[in-house]
UniProtKB/Swiss-Prot annotation:
Annotated TM spans: none
NCBIfam families from the UniProt entry: rpsS_bact (TIGR01050)
Biological role: Protein S19 forms a complex with S13 that binds strongly to the 16S ribosomal RNA.
Organism of provenance: Listeria monocytogenes serovar 1/2a (strain ATCC BAA-679 / EGD-e)
Keyword Ribonucleoprotein attributed: yes
GO molecular function: rRNA binding; structural constituent of ribosome
Keywords: Ribonucleoprotein, Ribosomal protein, RNA-binding, rRNA-binding
A GO cellular-component term linked to this record: cytoplasm
GO term, biological process aspect, one: ribosomal small subunit assembly
Full protein name: Small ribosomal subunit protein uS19
Similarity section: Belongs to the universal ribosomal protein uS19 family.
Length: 92
């Protein structure tokens, strides 16, 4: 289920302040955040946001087609190492 339309999208206040300050200063700096639950707004476009995945901060460059999605969608938390390989010796 998605979020109710009457509530509107959610962004943590501290993240919004950091993005607005970065937009005013016009410097290309990476914004660190732990807020994976925040929705990407149009003001985020062009910014690089380092999203925490539980181990490290993953840099995410925000593009126009990402607007409306959550930051956590672009920083996977699990590493997939693949299935076990075929063991030729045990098949015989």
């Amino acid at each position: 289920m998605g979020r109710s339309l009457k509530k509107g999208p959610f962004v943590d206040d501290h993240l919004m302040k950091k993005v607005e300050a970065a937009a005013e200063s016009e410097k290309k700096q990476v914004i660190k955040t732990w807020s994976r639950r925040s929705t990407i707004f149009p003001t985020f476009v062009g910014q690089t946001i380092a999203v925490y995945d539980g181990r490290k901060h993953v840099p995410v460059y925000v593009q126009e087609d990402m607007v409306g999605h959550k930051l956590g969608e672009f920083a996977p938390t699990r590493t997939y190492r693949g299935h076990a390989g075929d063991d030729k010796k045990t098949k015989r």
